[in-house]
Design a protein with these regions (language model features):
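N-terminal Sec-pathway targeting helices
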Residues: 5-17
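Extracytoplasmic cell-surface/polysaccharide-interacting catalytic and binding patches
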Residues: 25-257
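Bacterial N-terminal signal peptides
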Residues: 16-27
Length: 257
């Protein structure tokens, strides 16, 4: 009799242990972190933000957060953060089902790539605008100072065309109308919206420029809190950053918060 009781107790202990493990396993799988792991999706919180990163002083090909954008959604080879690519793929599939084709034409640019763009324009404009603040203001209509571009972050991308007129009629108008109606469902927002929306500071409107908010809002908050004007250096006109209020009016002058 004693032996039978002992055997029954062992069976009940074994059943209880298996049930407990099963319950814990189900609980783990249904947590957000486990779901992200199970589905292969990256976490939306970046815990490794640094000043060098938000100012573009890194190489995306050496950063595990980044990957090459698949060719079916890109016009050329470029890098973006993985969650941005996954979200854009979902958005592109939804768009194509409604007859709208979305292609990424520009992705991540680090500090040195942005410096090359800035200094090429600076030198090209010098005969007309000189080497002072007027030159910088002209460039800043559509291009960022190195160290202040949202393209540094791997969260921002340009879609389909860089010509303002493209989005005013026909195919381009249908595309921008679809984006303004649906992009928010996938985490994207229009950064430099029309002036008519009340955005009076910063760059000219860019219908093509969209940002993945779940990550870019983290970087913007860090940028506005940590980047100082003495951090701007090593390019033509860097000494003008404070006079131009690059941090407050350009980095902060957006409709995507």
């Amino acid at each position: 009799m004693l032996l039978l009781c002992s055997m029954n107790q062992k069976r009940w202990i074994a059943v209880f242990w298996v049930a407990s493990v099963f319950t814990l396993g189900i609980s783990w799988i249904t947590t957000p972190r486990a779901q992200a792991f199970h589905t292969g999706q990256a976490q939306e919180t970046d815990t490794s933000i640094t000043k060098r990163f938000v100012m573009g002083q890194f190489f995306p090909e050496r950063d595990a957060r980044f990957m090459i954008v698949p060719s079916e959604i890109a016009s050329k080879s470029m890098w973006l953060q993985k969650p941005v690519i996954f979200a854009f793929q979902k958005m592109a599939r939804a768009a194509i089902s409604q007859g709208i084709e979305l292609k990424i034409i520009s992705g991540t640019r680090n500090f040195w790539q942005q410096k090359a763009i800035w200094e090429r324009k600076w030198q090209s404009n010098t005969p007309m605008f000189g080497t002072g603040i007027d030159n910088a203001k002209h460039i800043l209509r559509y291009s960022s100072m190195p160290g202040s571009s949202r393209h540094h972050w791997g969260t921002d991308l340009d879609i389909n065309s860089l010509e303002p007129g493209y989005f005013r009629a026909g195919k381009g108008l249908r595309e921008i109308s679809w984006l303004r109606q649906h992009a928010g469902e996938f985490g994207f927002c229009e950064v430099y919206s029309p002036r008519s929306t009340g955005r009076l500071k910063g760059y000219e409107p860019e219908a093509w420029h969209w940002s993945y908010k779940p990550l870019s809002n983290q970087y913007l908050l860090y940028y506005l809190s940590n980047v100082k004007y003495e951090d701007f250096n090593q390019f033509y006109g860097s000494h003008l950053a404070k006079d131009l209020r690059i941090i407050e009016d350009f980095a902060g002058g957006i409709d995507c918060k």
